[in-house]
Amino acid sequence: MVSTSGRKLMTEDTVRTIQEELFPLCSLITPNLGEASLLLSNPVTDIEEMKLAACELANRYHCAVLVKGGHLSGNTMCDVLYNNGRFSLFEQQKIESRNLHGTGCTLSSAIAAFAARGKGLEEAVRQAKVYISTAIYHGKDLHIGHGNGPLCHFFSGEINFVPLNSTEEVIRKFPHK
């Protein structure tokens, strides 16, 4: 609905159709800050506002909500999951990269893949975040085209999903080759 650069990607009619026809079928929606702001007609700019937004969107659409905070100010990012009346925060250091095109789509696809493998939602999100951080890290030095480039979905090495509490742990476990 809204790109990472803040640009609207669809008409109001399309957004309304998504809200009325698609969201009722979802078990999870994953709006970024701009999308959460658009859906609620209120700015969402910090973690407390993300929690309020996640709760309100979950109540409105009757599903779990992961508000993605990749564009929060500062060096730390935080995603807020609201599921069954409970918040889970996923905080990590930002990885500096201009190659972030497709992060939201990749994250939601990875969550779906881990859920399909039998993981509970919180664990699926945690493992998807490890995957996405690793793909960002391995793609940060790629020079493909102009402007925002893609993540590196083809990094080598197996990810064994042990608890990793920070981006630094991800980088140590999966060094760039």
Short names for language-model regions:
Residues 38, 97-121:
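Short, small-residue alpha-helix embedded
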Residues 8-87:
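Conserved phosphate/ATP/ADP-binding segment of small-molecule kinases
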Residues 35, 70-72, 94-96, 128-132:
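Glycine-rich beta-alpha junction loops
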Residues 123-177:
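Charged C-terminal helix
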Residues 88-91, 134:
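A structural signal for small-residue-enriched, beta-sheet-centric alpha/beta enzyme cores
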Residues 82, 108, 112-116, 129, ...:
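Regular secondary-structure segments
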Residues 43-50, 116-126:
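Short, charged, surface-exposed loops that flank catalytic or proteolytic processing sites
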Residues 4-5:
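Conserved beta-loop-beta/alpha segment of the NTase-like Rossmann-fold superfamily
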